[in-house]
Amino acid sequence: MKKSTLFSIAIIAAIFITSCNNQTTTTTEKMETKTGITKAAWGTTDGKEVFLYTLTNAKGVQVKISNYGATVTSWVSPDKNDKPSSIVLGFDSLSGYLAKPPYFGAVVGRYGNRIAKGKFKIDTAQYTLATNNGQNALHGGLKGFDKQVWDATPASDSTASLELSYLSKDGEEGYPGNLKVSVRYTLTDDNELKIEYSATTDKATVLNVTNHSYFNLTGDVSNSILDHTLMIDADNYTPVDTTLIPTGEIKSVKGTPFDFTKAKKIGLEIGAVSGGYDHNFVLNKKDSSLSKIVELKDSISGRTLEVFTTQPGVQFYTGNFLDGTISTSAGKKINQHAAMCLETQHFPDSPNQPKFPTTLLLPGQQFYSITVYKLSVK
């Protein structure tokens, strides 16, 4: 056979092999956008395996969740120009979370928010908690739910739903009772991230569990959230002292910088609030039914985030303590007001505030709540 003929055959074979390889790559990419859930190893901590789960809906929107802290690490969706980016703060690797950032995307508990001086009573029993926020207990203590490795169970490979469970043992961080808690994340084809919380205990305890995602609808931390417009369906809020513990009062927002009953830019009156917003809003809810409580909009991306919940309150926090010392995985500094939180909850320090809705959970009772974050683009 002539050399030219052999050369031609080699060229044809190379083209065929390349074509096959390209097809394989394309097929893999298509599989990754199918509705469902995938799992990837993400490291170890405390001798336990940590995984990263990717939930994908029919529109290709993806939410990534780790069983470390039951943490939402990213929520990637397209903006009005069809450019995808994540609307929540997070890291690409476990090491970012082990460095103890400010609860990015984590589930916080056993008691989210603050308990004054780390103490409370149930009947005549006095409980003393680990204090990790000055003289107060914050978000469950030194090693709360956000720093635990949870057990994770996908609903199925074809369903974008993940359930995580954790046993908080009696005495953990000072809290009484063996508490079995579970969190189920579901990403719907309507771009809703549903978060369902449930818990039972074998001894009277207190519980206030929430998700601590930091949102920036522009998808870029270089842009402040002060230009986002916000509506909160709350006629009242709970004023706080200098350590951010509620005074026990419930005050009207009317005529104050806390009035978001009609949508306004977050930055419009933030200068009149010492340190920025970090307050609980008393939602206009008569019962525990699921209802819309927040609408957040960004004109740059065209994104709108609606929040629905069964909870009586929401903590609106404008990232006041972000100071540029933490950077994204891409190396961008996360400065003050680079993101904001909308933490659905019972009120801070409720165990010490008899006028607030109770957070007491008794044996034989089952705690259940649901919060839905719905994303849309115009």
Map each language-model feature to its residues.
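C-terminal motif of bacterial Sec signal peptides marking the signal peptidase cleavage site
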Residues: 16-19
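Positively charged n-region of N-terminal signal peptides that target proteins for export
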Residues: 1-6, 21-22
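An exposed, glycine/acidic-rich loop-and-rim segment of catalytic or binding clefts
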Residues: 21-378
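Sec-dependent N-terminal signal peptides
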Residues: 6-12
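Alpha-helical transmembrane segments and their juxtamembrane interfaces
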Residues: 12-13, 222
